Amino acid sequence: MAGFRLTTKVQVSGWRFLLRRVEHAIVRRDTRMFDDPLQFYSRAVFAGVVVSVLICLGAALMAYFKPLGKQGSDQLLVDRTTNQLYVMLPGSNQLRPVYNLTSARLVLGNASNPVAVKSEELNRISKGQSIGIPGAPYATPTGTPASQWTLCDTVAKPDSSAPKVETSILIRTLAIDSGVGPIRADQGMLVSYEGANWLITEGGRHSIDLADRAVTSAVGIPVTAKPTPISQGLFNALPNRGPWQLPQIPAAGAPNSVGLPENLVIGSVFRTATESDPQHYVVLPDGVARVNNTTAAALRATNSYGLMQPPAVEASVVAKIPEQVYVSPLPDQPLDVLLRQDSPVLCWSWQREPGDQAPKTTVIAGRRLPLPANAIGTGIDQIGGDSTVYIEGGQFVRLQSPDPRVGESMYYIDPQGVRYGIANDDAAKNLGLAGPVNAPWQVVGLLVDGPVLSKEAALIEHDTLPADPNPRKVASGEG
């Protein structure tokens, strides 16, 4: 055998060494070969070949055990050609076309995603009637949970005989600045609803009789003030804080019997001198009561009983008289009444952050909606409702109705601002919804109401979908 060995191992090794040296000369322009970095290149090529072979082998195994476009054991399928959704009901060998992914998940009881299958594969399986919830959202994605819910009225042409009111629902964080912000304690706004006049303050709404100039002048409402209308939704959201009218004083005008001068009859106002501002009192049948400046002004404007100014009485005399309580709803100081011409936007905002024991409500007024600049014009003008909705993604909410007899309810609000009732916790879990945020019914109740999302509703068969009873033609220029 030795006669057939034309080269030796040493010769082969030397030949390979010379090849590497030539390679160094060409690539590195150096034949000394103090180091050999080129050896890593060959190793990288070898490693790449190995990885490629492993990937090809894995793809071949996956294609064999789980071929693409085959049904397998999956129950939620989608046609790769038409994107039609199908479900295979448990215990059935029929495919059921389903209207939306929401219905499919409710039927199957989990939040799985559809598997794409070839049309040829689906055509080999028998099919039944379509099932699902007509009008349900295709899916139930959620955005950033909203902790602030706001209802706004914007009055157009407030000086006209019939001002127009536009309602907006803001399910997002507000942008407060010098142009729009909370009403201060010393501010108010005059509005009307169904023929009645109301004064809006930081705490809510107060009914007020504009013909009672004794009260209106005392609280700072000018004679030229004109109430502007508000929507039913905003009226219901603003809490009723009671009427701004003076309580009647029994036996007003009769002589007092508490030891005051004769000119101070029951119902009259006097003052005591103090180091700061004078303290006003009103005479009652069985004593005297402290009143603030606006109440004193309103009482005197109603009937001053011939007194040009409130008489001054020594504090030592007043101290001997029984002190009673005269309950007046009027503020301590006259208000700065905001005009709708300057502040056409009026809002009620509800906010409850995680950990808060109770929600915080705020009355907001200003020249524009409290939205950031990039959100202006992004509202959804609902067809079935009277509002424009500004919302950041879908919301899963749990709300407490103002009526304690109703109890709690869960809703999913889709990115179009439509609310859908969630039947129970199981339905929410099957839709992939968790961690509902708190929301006020005063705002949620104004959204367009969609169907209830439940398994029972999703298991209803249909020949065809009913027509929309309230369609709207696409605006010109959009289609």
Curated annotation (Swiss-Prot):
Bilayer-crossing residues are 45-65
Extract the ranges annotated as region (Structural repeat A1/1). 75-127
Q: Which residues lie on this side of the membrane: Cytoplasmic?
A: 1-44
Q: Where in the cell is it found?
A: Cell inner membrane
Q: Report the principal subcellular site.
A: membrane
Which family does the record claim for this protein?
Answer: Belongs to the EccB family.
**What name is this protein filed under?**
ESX-1 secretion system ATPase EccB1
**Gene designation per UniProt:** eccB1
